UniProtKB/Swiss-Prot annotation:
Pfam families: Ribosomal_S15. One of the primary rRNA binding proteins, it binds directly to 16S rRNA where it helps nucleate assembly of the platform of the 30S subunit by binding and bridging several RNA helices of the 16S rRNA. Forms an intersubunit bridge (bridge B4) with the 23S rRNA of the 50S subunit in the ribosome. One of its GO terms (molecular function) is structural constituent of ribosome. Keywords: Ribonucleoprotein, Ribosomal protein, RNA-binding, rRNA-binding. Belongs to the universal ribosomal protein uS15 family. Part of the 30S ribosomal subunit. Forms a bridge to the 50S subunit in the 70S ribosome, contacting the 23S rRNA. PROSITE patterns: RIBOSOMAL_S15. One of its GO terms (cellular component) is cytosolic small ribosomal subunit. It comes from Mycoplasmopsis pulmonis (strain UAB CTIP) (Mycoplasma pulmonis). One of its GO terms (biological process) is translation. This is Small ribosomal subunit protein uS15. The keyword Cytoplasm does not apply.
Length: 88
């Protein structure tokens, strides 16, 4: 889980204000942070299969949110993936 301070920072950066944590861009940023943190965890704990299930669920949720954002607002999609460096 991400702490509240980091969520506020991501909300300001991607959503415009610290209370805009429900914006799609902010949700994607939070999930990306969690995914990056779990990648580091799995480098040291290769046999942690139970956490891997949650990791895959987070990846799938982010994938769905990115697809939705791409359909709804393509410009915002492009800026989000460039800021997060998650696609080419």
């Amino acid at each position: 889980m991400t702490d509240k301070k980091l969520v506020k920072e991501l909300a300001i950066e991607f959503g415009g204000s610290e209370k805009n944590v429900g914006a799609i861009e902010v949700q994607i940023a939070i999930l990306t942070h969690d995914i990056e943190r779990l990648k580091i965890h799995f480098e040291t704990n290769k046999k942690d299969k139970h956490s891997k299930r949650g990791f895959i669920a987070k990846i799938n949720k982010r994938k769905k949110l990115l697809a939705y954002l791409k359909d709804v607002n393509f410009e915002s999609y492009q800026t989000t993936i460039q800021k997060l460096k998650i696609r080419k």
